Amino acid sequence: MGYGRSAGFGEIKMKVITVAAAIILNAQQQLLVVRKHHTACFMQVGGKLEPNELPEATMLREIQEEIGCEARIEKFIGRFETMAANEPDHQLVSYVYFVELNEQPHIDAEIAEMKWIDLDDTDTRLAPLTKEVAIPWVKKYLAEAVV
């Protein structure tokens, strides 16, 4: 007599967090990253979507809340899936935008640290989205801009 296997048995279902995230560069072609209070990894400015909020609106709201700036979305980069940096066993679904700031950023809201990093930075502990999506996109963007 065999044992039946119910659907989903043995599968691990990850929780999903949906966010909007910004790629912001300065004149020195450095990437802006922030670290929120009580977290270890630096990441893109951004945050979770509110109910019925479009990712573009989330992006502009989070930029204002986290770094106190007005901004303009230059380009939608894409929708990406990575592991969440600070929530174990969570998948991050990110709507990523290339953004231009209208003023100098400063720490606000839940941000503990903010810094501009070089694209080859190996000293800063970075979130998966920053390592796997943001930095490769910026390198490609800058290489194409030179041509």
Descriptions of predicted regions:
Residues 69-79:
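A short coil-to-beta-strand element that immediately follows conserved catalytic motifs
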Residues 17, 44, 71, 92-94:
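Short connector loops at helix/strand junctions that flank enzyme active sites
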Residues 24-25, 33, 99, 116:
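Conserved hydrophobic "DFG−1" position in protein kinase catalytic cores
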Residues 96-98, 106-139:
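NUDIX/MutT-family hydrolases
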Residues 26, 30-65, 69:
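Conserved Nudix-box catalytic region and its N-terminal flanking loop in Nudix hydrolases
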Residues 81-105, 137:
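Active-site-adjacent beta-strand/loop module that shapes the phosphate/pyrophosphate-binding cleft
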Residues 1-13:
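N-terminal amphipathic/basic-hydrophobic helices that include classical n-h-c signal peptides
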Residues 10-31, 48:
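Conserved N-terminal beta-strand and adjoining loop/helix that marks the start
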